[in-house]
Amino acid sequence: MKYIVLLRGINISGKNKILMNELKIELEKKYNNVMTYLNSGNIILESFESKKNITNEILKIINDKFNLKIPIHILTFDELNDIFENIPSWIKMKDKEFYNNIIFIIPPENYINVYNQLGKISENIEMVKEYNNVIFWSYNLKNYKKSNWWIKTASTSIKDSITIRTVNTMKRVLELCSENSRM
């Protein structure tokens, strides 16, 4: 089965530094067709193991090799494909005035708790839609500092229970998964 692994909060402003090439080498010892995309912790791999086993193994590798304890989120290729099949219409419009993201909620956390922590969105500045324990979140580029969620995603206690990727990043990850399937 093909999995997408999202590492939360790595290689940002020199913190939680993980060299993706080194991590890839470690992962290749245990998993097949390992691929990384960007330096922000996007990994594609194949395994017959469960999400739980993969999560535990990757957490161990990261702790042993890089001496870090970071949250990770794992989803299957089919789950990511389903997310894109249910993307909101406002994102499909590709409005250049908005920055489009997907917030992945790391289990056991859930949407209701995340929403309660982040609070109500700033109308006319941001838009959200929940789908299957992810949140599509877009905000106006000109007014992003006025966005309630933009301020709170990095500063509230919920920050370790979510990982955020741009729609474009995840679209490319999905494409890489598809390309790798044809090889």
Predicted feature residues:
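Surface-exposed, charge/polar-rich loops and edge strands
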Residues: 3-40, 44-183
